[in-house]
């Protein structure tokens, strides 16, 4: 990565800081300036959310207050959830965050959990996600990559999550608007802001909090600790939380078919740990200057079994097995930041915030194939029950091992292990002869580990040369020893080279072999943010201006690891390769046998993607102009300059396989010779060089310059009526994999396309809101038009050219490429309302009723449905709060309509042999009832209880249904019968409990 250089933003800050000295006027400080007193601490200084002034959150005490009785009319297409609301609704993950939001759902990703959000007909990378102004990891969105790899569970191709306990506020913005976050906000954006010490120190100079919780749906336990304090000019916050649980249990989980394969009815078993630590340390030398150093880390670790993996030898879990597919996945995020805030009023700003952040995100999928370590494992099998006692091998009865030539049931004489009465030992499966192996003792064969065997005493061996010879039992002294790394080994060497002396051991490896594949997707970001606000009056018109910029460098790379090794050796496992015939130690290079214990192998790092560094330079401004008491206008503009710079360095960067790119654009030179079939013969060096030349050809710089805008108006003709309109534009630049991903195979070749254009969206929306002390009722109509959608297009059959213009291959290649092809339109209507019953009936003070509703419909060009559109959804809420907030409760009734066949599209319907393109397995309509309550027996203790799916309804969400794959090895069902679909159903009746104490 190139050096993180200063840009024009840094110089403007330096100029502004100089100006702040000259224009500092303490007597004219605004009322919300920070001081060392808690009552004046602002909790919502501008971040890189880049919202205009009218959209800035009002200062709130997010811990002590609850917006459950808030009558403020909602902003158009926007939902804001404070920490108190998240706590009240017992939100523990992204699914809970949008549980009672209509028009927003979480994208399901099977074994890897969730992957971002779906809003307005688009999902994942088309819905921006930021944490404290930093974009979170994007998925590899190339459709070609998804078709090749996503159905097989080899990549954790998901968007990372956040820890809910650390959040000050979560804002969900629906509709295209890149003024706020830049690239990615096509369907909307989800913006998170973390807490700091000021949010806790509103009444005193210290705070201690502890929270414990439990959820039955996934058996998740929560422990969270919060420490905050202030001393003179310093304040600090430490928050640590740990969640430990299991898989989300589907409906009727306990009675589901516990088998392997795609027809499995139970959710695959996983042990999931989520751990988060947020540390912020601040220094305020004066009331106008504040410096903060912060560290925000989040780790999600999941281990378990892919029992639903389709490539299994048997559906029965309790049968003998060679290996089982294990998962060991993680998502890790770490952000270290430095922030400077200035609240001195100058001609250029009222508030200034300058921050530098360094974030690293890793999403890892690790698959390990091994047996679980019991006697059913082939590598541990010991059917004869041979034992090691006092350094000697004995039979299952504890007697010395006896080997005889015995006639078997087929009339053939074979070596068999017998008891002291010369009767062959029985075995549960197979034959006695197959259950043991005679290890030949000699310097070039088998050595005993003297830390396990007693090498000072004679050992029993059997002399025979062929398997049909009567073995001769002997006791021999181990006459050859050697020492390796301080460990002693011994064997026996006969004076007659024709003699063969064998030691009887179980016929298995004696250790646990493990094959692994580990795929890392790494996103590294270095970013500078500058955000300023200024309130001023021009020609008697009030303006609230926010402006600033971003300079960021982001590197996206893939690192693949693979290999095998052995572990957990038993007493009979080989511990050394022995010596060669030349009397030197035998090495793994010389040994042709597979031995993961003695010769583990870890492949060199590889990749399917060229690493790409993305440089983003952005400038923005947003102004809320109050033209009249009844009319205000919002104007927003943003300019983004985004450059992609591939960074493939041969020998340093993880290697891209030569066969994926060779001859793709640059042909091989004329061959020096031909094989016996007349095919040209190239040296490995020629092939390597040609692959590097093709990568260099593919790795071209790409630059995008985009303008975004947002126009809005708010009209209040009456004190109870508000009309809002909004017209905004969003965009998403192609991801690096969409531009550069390359794959060469006769059946499926993908070409890179550096000529793609950014996707665009234009959003039109109008909202009508009635509001008063009794509450509010708001309805809005929206339409979003998308263009330049990126999709995978079939280019036909082609043949690569050789150096003289002829065909390079014997057969044509089926060629695909990412291109801008589709347009789309989504339209719909939403309702959001709240009624305070106490306004009409004094005795019912504290009661409220709410209602939310979303209906949307969308089509791509060619009348193709958009699968990311949610079915019609409504949420009715009934709540109560004690006037002193000692207790309260909420009842939610959610109704979701069925997903109609005409509103779904299966892009693989022809390959599956279907006549129509509708998705075969869809969600039906369902109604859910949830009840949540809290009680504060004393001021500093809060107890919460929630019951979800109160009526124990069996239901399948559309997001879960559309996560079912039509091909591959993971997330499958029997498409013909539907067997296995129960695994995708949501939990039945489940509960959440929590207790929190604060001081």
From Swiss-Prot:
Residues 25-52 are annotated as: Disordered. It holds the Pfam family Plug. It is a multi-pass membrane protein. It comes from the Bacteria. A motif (TonB box) lies at residues 58-65. Residues 68-195 form the TBDR plug domain. Residues 203-999 form the TBDR beta-barrel domain. Keywords: Cell outer membrane, Membrane, Receptor, Repeat, Signal, TonB box, Transmembrane, Transmembrane beta strand, Transport. InterPro entries: Plug_dom, Plug_dom_sf, PT, TonB-dep_rcpt-like, TonB-dep_rcpt_b-brl, TonB_Hb/transfer/lactofer_rcpt, TonB_rcpt_b-brl_sf, TonB_rcpt_CS. It is found in: Cell outer membrane. GO terms for biological process: siderophore transmembrane transport. Residues 26-50 have a biased composition (Low complexity). GO terms for molecular function: siderophore uptake transmembrane transporter activity. GO terms for cellular component: cell outer membrane. Sequence repeats lie at residues 26-29, 30-33, 34-37, 38-41, 42-45, 46-49. Residues 26-49 are annotated as: 6 X 4 AA tandem repeats of P-T-N-Q. Residues 1-24 form the signal peptide. A motif (TonB C-terminal box) lies at residues 982-999. CDD domains: ligand_gated_channel. This protein is subject to phase-variable expression associated with alteration in the length of the CCAA repeat region. This mechanism is called slipped-strand mispairing. Addition or loss of CCAA repeat units would change the reading frame and result in introduction of stop codons downstream of the repeat region. This may be a mechanism of regulation and a way to avoid the immunological response of the host. NCBIfam families: TonB-hemlactrns. Acts as a receptor for hemoglobin or the hemoglobin/haptoglobin complex of the human host and is required for heme uptake. Belongs to the TonB-dependent receptor family. Hemoglobin/haptoglobin binding protein subfamily. This is Probable hemoglobin and hemoglobin-haptoglobin-binding protein 4. It comes from Haemophilus influenzae (strain ATCC 51907 / DSM 11121 / KW20 / Rd). The lineage of its organism: Bacteria, Pseudomonadati, Pseudomonadota, Gammaproteobacteria, Pasteurellales.
């Amino acid at each position: 990565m190139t050096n993180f250089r200063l840009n024009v933003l840094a110089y403007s800050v330096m100029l502004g800081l100089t100006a702040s000295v000259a224009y500092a006027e303490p007597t004219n400080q605004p009322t919300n300036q920070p001081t060392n007193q808690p009552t004046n601490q602002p909790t919502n200084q501008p971040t890189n959310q880049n919202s205009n002034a009218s959209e800035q959150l009002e200062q709130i005490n997010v811990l002590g207050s609850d917006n459950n009785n808030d009558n403020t009319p909602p902003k158009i297409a926007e939902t804001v959830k404070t920490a108190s609301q998240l706590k009240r609704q017992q939100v523990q993950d992204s699914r809970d965050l949008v549980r009672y939001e209509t028009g927003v759902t979480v994208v399901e990703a099977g074994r890897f959990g969730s992957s971002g959000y779906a809003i307005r007909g688009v999902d994942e990378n088309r819905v921006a996600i930021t944490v404290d102004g930093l974009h979170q990891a994007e998925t590899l969105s190339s459709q070609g990559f998804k078709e090749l790899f996503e159905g097989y569970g080899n990549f954790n191709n998901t968007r990372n999550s956040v820890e809910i306990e650390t959040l000050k506020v979560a804002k969900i913005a629906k509709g295209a608007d890149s003024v706020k976050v830049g690239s990615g906000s096509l369907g909307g954006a989800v913006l998170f802001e973390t807490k700091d010490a000021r949010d806790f120190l509103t009444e005193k100079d210290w705070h201690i909090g502890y929270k414990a919780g439990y959820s039955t749906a996934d058996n998740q336990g929560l422990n969270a600790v919060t420490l905050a304090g202030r001393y003179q000019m310093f304040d600090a916050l430490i928050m640590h939380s740990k969640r430990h649980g299991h898989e989300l249990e589907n409906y009727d989980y306990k009675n589901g078919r516990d088998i392997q394969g795609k027809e499995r009815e139970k959710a695959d078993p996983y042990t999931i740990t989520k751990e988060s630590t947020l540390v912020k340390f601040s220094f305020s030398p004066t009331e106008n200057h504040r410096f903060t150093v912060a560290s925000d880390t989040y780790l999600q670790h999941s281990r378990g079994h892919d029992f639903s993996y389709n490539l299994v030898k048997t559906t029965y879990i309790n049968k003998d097995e060679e290996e089982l597919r294990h998962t060991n996945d993680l998502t890790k995020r770490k952000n270290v930041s430095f922030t400077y805030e200035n609240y001195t009023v100058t001609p250029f700003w009222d508030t200034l915030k300058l921050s530098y952040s360094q974030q690293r995100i890793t999403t890892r999928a690790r698959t390990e194939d091994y047996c679980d370590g019991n006697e059913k494992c082939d590598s541990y099998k010991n059917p004869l029950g041979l034992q090691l006692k006092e350094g000697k091998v004995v039979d299952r009865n504890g007697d010395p091992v006896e080997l005889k030539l015995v006639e078997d049931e087929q009339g053939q004489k074979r070596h068999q292990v017998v008891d002291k009465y010369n009767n062959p030992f029985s075995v549960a499966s197979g034959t006695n002869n197959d259950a043991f192996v005679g290890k030949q003792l000699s310097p070039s064969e088998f050595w005993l580990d003297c830390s396990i065997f007693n090498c000072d005493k004679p050992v029993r061996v059997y002399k025979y040369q062929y398997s049909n010879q009567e073995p001769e039992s002997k006791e021999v002294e181990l006459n050859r020893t050697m020492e390796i790394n301080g460990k002693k080994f011994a064997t026996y060497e006969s004076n007659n080279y024709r003699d063969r002396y064998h030691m009887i051991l179980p016929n298995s490896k004696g250790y646990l072999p493990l094959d692994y594949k580990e795929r890392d997707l790494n996103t590294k970001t270095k970013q500078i943010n500058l955000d300023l606000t200024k309130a001023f009056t021009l020609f008697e018109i009030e303006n609230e201006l926010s402006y600033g910029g971003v300079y960021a460098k982001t590197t996206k790379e893939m690192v693949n690891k693979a290999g095998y090794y052995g572990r957990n050796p038993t007493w009979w496992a080989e511990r050394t390769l022995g010596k060669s015939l030349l009397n030197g130690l035998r090495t793994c290079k010389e040994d042709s046998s597979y031995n993961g214990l003695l010769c583990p192998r870890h492949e060199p790092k590889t990749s399917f993607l060229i690493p790409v560094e993305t440089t983003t330079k952005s400038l923005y401004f947003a102004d809320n102009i109050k033209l009249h008491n009844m009319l205000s206008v919002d104007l927003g503009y943003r300019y983004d300059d985004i450059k992609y710079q591939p960074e493939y360095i041969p020998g340093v960067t993880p290697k891209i396989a030569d066969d994926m790119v060779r001859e793709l654009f640059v042909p091989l030179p004329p061959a020096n010779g031909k094989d016996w079939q007349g095919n040209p013969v190239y040296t490995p060096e020629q092939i390597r060089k040609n692959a590097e030349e093709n990568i260099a050809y593919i790795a071209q710089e790409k630059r995008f310059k985009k303008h975004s805008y947002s126009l809005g108006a708010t009209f209040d003709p009456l004190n109870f009526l508000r009309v809002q309109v909004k017209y905004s534009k969003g965009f998403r630049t192609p991801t690096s994999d969409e531009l550069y991903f390359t794959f060469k195979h006769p059946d499926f070749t993908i070409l890179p396309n550096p000529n793609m254009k950014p996707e665009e969206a234009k959003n039109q929306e109008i909202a009508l809101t009635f509001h008063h002390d009794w509450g509010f009722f708001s309805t809005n109509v929206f339409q979003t038009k998308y263009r330049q959608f990126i999709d995978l297009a079939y280019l036909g059959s082609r043949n690569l050219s050789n150096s003289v213009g002829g065909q390079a291959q014997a057969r044509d290649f089926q060629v695909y490429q990412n291109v801008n092809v589709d347009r789309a339109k989504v339209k719909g209507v939403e309702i959001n309302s709240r009624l305070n019953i106490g306004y009409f009936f004094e005795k019912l003070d504290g009661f409220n009723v709410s209602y939310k509703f979303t209906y949307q419909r969308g089509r791509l060009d060619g009348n193709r449905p958009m699968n990311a559109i949610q079915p019609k959804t409504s949420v009715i809420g009934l709540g109560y709060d004690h006037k002193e907030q000692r207790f309260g409760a909420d009842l939610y009734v959610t109704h979701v309509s069925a997903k109609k066949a005409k509103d779904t599209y299966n892009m693989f319907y022809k390959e599956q042999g279907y006549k129509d393109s509708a998705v075969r397995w869809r969600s039906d309509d369902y109604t859910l009832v949830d009840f949540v309550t809290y009680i504060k027996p004393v001021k500093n203790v809060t107890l919460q209880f929630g019951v979800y799916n109160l009526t124990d309804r069996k239901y399948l969400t559309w997001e879960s249904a559309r996560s079912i794959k039509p091909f591959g090895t993971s997330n499958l069902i029997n498409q013909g019968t539907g067997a296995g679909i129960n695994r995708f159903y949501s939990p039945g009746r489940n509960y959440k409990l929590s207790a929190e104490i604060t001081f």
